[in-house]
Amino acid sequence: MRADKMSIPGVQPKLSAVLRVSQQSFELVDRGGKFILKPNPPAYEEVPANEALTMRMAAVAGVEVPAHGLLRAVDDSWVYFVKRYDRVGRSGRVHVEDFSQLIGANRETKYDSSLEKVAELIERLCTFPAIEKPKLAQRLLFCFLTGNEDMHLKNFSLWYRDGVVSLTPAYDLLNSTLVLGQAKEESALPLNGKKKNLTRKLCLSYFCKERLGLNESQIEAILKKLSVALPVWRQLIDRSYLSKAAKEAYTEILEERVARLKLG
């Protein structure tokens, strides 16, 4: 367990809501919500705009994400919203388990694992692990590039649909390094025992190739998607609802990680 700081999503308020199209608004509900609304947590700054931006950047890179966006609250503050991917029809549900549940961990022990363990669970539990492993590799690289050092076990999930077990769409993606300031780590879960000073060799040769078993063409395909997305990311950051200072800080984090991965 990490005692030095709290998980951002762990302290971020989450509200259940349904969309009232005719009223062009969300209505808060106790049950049956199809959307989650996330106002800005008091302890941090610009989290909704940060998450909306980062999720959009993920989508541009080909990472599957739920429908999401920003809305203005009555007090003129930003609220992030995201559609629940585990709800279907009027009252249907898709069975979902996060990786913390899969290994019997809890909110206090969600950091007590490793990315190797995540890969192992995908290999053991997914119906088609060869399809899911490149997804995991891409998410790892994306989170590294966008300063997300808070991807713990509860931020990875499997869903069970039509007899097939696979990774859910990505969620809770944000630049946590930007929110928390000078982060001590670069990954919530260790990679070959390391949580900081991650390198291209560690991410690609060790994790993607050795641990996930991806071949060179698969790795190159992932890197190409990220490289193609890079100029669009820069535009998205510049056009985002972050403050000028936050835009500059986000860009600085991104460019340093891009250089380290030798991307683009």
Report the location of each language-model feature.
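A residue-level signal for conserved active-site and pocket-lining positions in enzyme catalytic cores
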Residues: 17, 58, 99, 150, ...
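Conserved ATP-binding subdomain of kinase catalytic cores across diverse folds
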Residues: 1-112, 159
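Catalytic-core segments of enzymes that bind and process phosphorylated/nucleotide-bearing substrates
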Residues: 98, 102-121, 160-217
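Conserved kinase catalytic-core segment
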Residues: 43-59, 114-179
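Small/polar glycine-rich anion-binding or flexible loop at a beta-alpha turn
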Residues: 219-230
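Short alpha-helical scaffolding segments that buttress acidic/His motifs in well-ordered protein cores
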Residues: 136-140, 223, 236
